[in-house]
Curated annotation (Swiss-Prot):
It holds the Pfam family YpoC. It comes from the Bacteria. Keywords: Phosphoprotein. The keyword Phosphoprotein applies. The modification Phosphoserine is found at S117. This is Uncharacterized protein YpoC.
Length: 164
């Protein structure tokens, strides 16, 4: 668990250092930093967690783009991929958990994230994410993250349909 906490804390610092968005396109902003809107202090307009039906699917699209970029790496028999891309995928999952609950991601503190209750979530999501964080560049972790996000999509759409 300590390693998971350290990896996420380090990645949170990196995301917070990215600064202001350069594009008015929401998807491009999320591709650069999936939690830009959560960490930004000067927000105006639509907040993604206030309209999860519109914005959570964008997180799933960001993962689809990441997945498309990582698949060729594994198809060339390389056993490792870019850690930042995998961490970005994990952050997309974490943001989707929060936005579905109607709240921003305040921090990537692993202890807080694990203990929090979410209205829509994959089964054993915390244990599975922790497993991924131990070796995020490996193929089996990539597959596990893809399965987690696929499950999250199902839970999100079910939750969204039942709570309109």
């Amino acid at each position: 668990m300590t390693q998971a906490k350290e990896v996420l804390a380090s990645y949170e610092q990196y995301l917070r250092s990215l600064g202001q968005k350069s594009s008015s396109d929401m998807k491009k902003t999320l591709q650069t930093n999936p939690v830009y809107f959560d960490f930004c202090t000067e927000l105006q307009g639509d907040l993604p967690w206030e309209d999860s039906g519109k914005y959570v699917p964008l997180l799933f699209e960001v993962w689809d783009d990441i997945k498309a970029s990582l698949l060729p790496v594994f198809q060339t028999r390389k056993s490792r991929c870019d850690q930042n891309e995998m961490l970005k995928g994990i952050v997309c999952l974490l943001a989707s958990l929060h936005w579905t609950a109607g709240e921003p991601v305040k921090s990537l503190d692993w202890q807080e994230l694990r203990e929090k209750s979410y209205p829509a979530k994959p089964i054993n999501w915390a244990e599975r994410v922790e497993f991924i964080l131990l070796k995020p560049t490996q193929y089996h972790c990539f597959i596990q993250l893809d399965e987690l996000i696929t499950e999250m999509k199902k839970h999100f759409y079910k939750y969204h349909a039942m709570n309109r």
